[in-house]
Amino acid sequence: MWISTSRLLAYLYGLVFAVGGLAASDADTDFTSVRSQFVKNYSGTGPSEPGEKYFQESSFHYHYDGRFANEPLSDKETPPHLSQLIRTYLSTMADLGAETWIMHGTLLAWWWNQKIFPWDNDIDVQISEPTIHFLDEYYNMTEHHFDIPGLNGGRTYLLEINPNYVFRSMDDKMNVIDARWIDTSSGLFIDITAVRPDDERRKDGDTGALMCKDGHTFDENDIFPLRNSHFEDFPVKVPFEYVKLLEEEYGSQSLTATEFDDHHFNEETLVWDSASKRKRSSRRRSAVDLPVRTTPLKYKLE
């Protein structure tokens, strides 16, 4: 008999709690405070009301998961880590047949040169509502190992689903991120938000209205059909009306201004060069070092 990951984790939680009650200890630990809180109640039905903030950021930087790091990477180390972070995520979603696309600042970076901004330290993607349900049912809290060219031992990435994703309202302001893809070697992560039908706007006759819990609203025609492209030398999907979406979020100047955050965009090399250091960015278009999955995937979306 097959048992879903969510139900198995709930069972393990109960088992650990029961065993702990049988063994008296002078140093009792509150189980929920142990943040290998990888064992949580994923009963499959979801909680009855929104909980407290689920995803926690580190005390030293809000784009790091403090369970896996105690300090940020250097400016030199960050770009290659982010590059493999998005490649492994996109590779995994493609292997699963799961619909995903880049959004927000990551989409803007794609617009310029299909590379992560050299000053950036986060990545934003979106997924469809059927995809978040599938990932929660079959792949929540799963680890995915990849061989990384030039790196002994490779890296392991964690897919973690926020159980509060079942609450589809923007009122759940503490849980606007629905899932994360986390680099367990550095603590860097990808924020994953699910795009859902906007029930309130649809009641008012806007039949194609979509929304995310983070407050962003869209029309179906803004996103679908998705376009094929490349990002960090890897196949990626982008929203259909990407120019419209970027202008609405960042203004039209974001698509033309070649000076930003102490960097200048070199029209010849298509690279953001550091202005203060008066030297070209190390982010050259070089040989592609793509990751290779070593963890098998049992279930896929049809």
Regions found by a protein language model. Name each.
Residues 82-86, 90, 94, 142-210, ...:
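Conserved catalytic core of two-metal-ion nucleotidyltransferases
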Residues 70-81, 117-124, 235:
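The substrate-binding groove and active-site-proximal loops of carbohydrate-active enzymes
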Residues 21-103:
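Helical scaffold of the NTase/Pol beta-like nucleotidyltransferase catalytic core
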Residues 114-135, 233:
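Catalytic metal-binding acidic patch
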Residues 243-255:
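Short, surface-exposed, low-complexity cationic segments
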Residues 100-103, 124-128, 191, 237:
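Structural recognition of the beta-strand scaffold that forms the well-ordered cores
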Residues 103-111:
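Short, solvent-exposed turn/loop segments enriched in Gly/Ser/Thr/Pro and often Arg
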Residues 1-25:
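Fungal secretory targeting signals
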